[in-house]
Amino acid sequence: MKYAASLLLLIIITFSVYAQPKTDSFLENLIRSNASPFLKDVLNQPDTFQYQIIYTRINRDKRNKPHFKNFYFNVDRNRYFNPASTVKLPTALIALEKLNELNKPGVDKYTTMLTDSSFEKQTSILTDTSSGGGLPSIAQYIRKIFLVSDNDAYNRLYEFNGQQTTNEKLWRKGYKDTRITRRFVTMNEEQNRHTNAIRFMKDGRLLYEQPPAYSTVSFDFSKKIWIGHAHYNRDDSLINSPMDFTTHNNLPLEDLRQMLQSVLFPSSGPAKQQFNLTKDDYNFLYQYMSELPYESSHPKYDTTEFFDSYTKFFFFKAGKEKIPSHIRSFNKPGWSYGFLTDAAYIADFKNNVEFMISGVIYVNKDGVLNDDKYEYEETGYPFFKEVGTIIYNYELKRPRKYIPDLSNFKIIYH
């Protein structure tokens, strides 16, 4: 009886757990056998650090077609983690898909997009000083999303897509557990259902106008999610109770990994999971998923703040490490509320090595949310560095029947 009561309390107060986490002994043994004392200590506390790791092995056949095998370590899609900026990946993909399906003459990702204010708390955007021409566009927002994980850029794509369109498209692609309910700005649930009017312009001429939208989509919020033991609310007052994440964005690690694969290898998965993108869209995404801040001229970034590995958790951000010129990470990370997440495709053009690696960890020793006291530097980034290095070193030695041709991912950066 005591055990049952304890289990019920765990489900209600912390994370809902309905099944055993998925773990492949191969991956667990590989990581543990090469782990430092620091990493072993983290791995021995799965309930504290809530880590999940997916390693995707890629083998090419004689036609260079990729074949994928996933290995899991403590992966549980029912265990909630806050996805933070990782939701920007599907949001960007839906924006490009929606543009292609609109099929309006003269309207593409490079066309000037003006955002109007149509409901309470909404803001308008009529200029963008980060772009070469000083005007906002879908393309410029996507650049900023992948280069430095810009929040306002995400908000503008969220508004262009509309909450309902975003979620219904993702669900139709099979991502039933994914939900994107909110901008990254202080708004309530009702305000996030309203999205702004949008205008696409060229030389002062209106090409297409999208009216304000209201989302009537129904979300399943029956599973209550509480994290921590205290939190600061929007008024910066300390509340001595767990923080409620029931209505927050959700993106399971397995879904994030599959979305990344579907973009980098569009013919590799089920047809229904593919995004309706053009060849130019794919090339554009590959460039800005892998480009480093110093390589960008528009936007131009202060490289002291936005250093090479600013968005590259696997396996470089710890210590603000420089990334070797022969290695590129095509990825999307997220960080918020003590959760760090990254899903990456790593390509080593010198050694002809490629693999995917995805992971999440929770580093919040004091259990207080929104206090900006998280162990990102001490524990989080070193976790990604060491796990990534272990997998990379294994890949360097792993025999391959066919050497991959990675030319599709070799990009000339401006």
Which residue stretches match the model-derived regions?
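Bacterial Sec-dependent N-terminal signal peptides
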Residues: 1-25
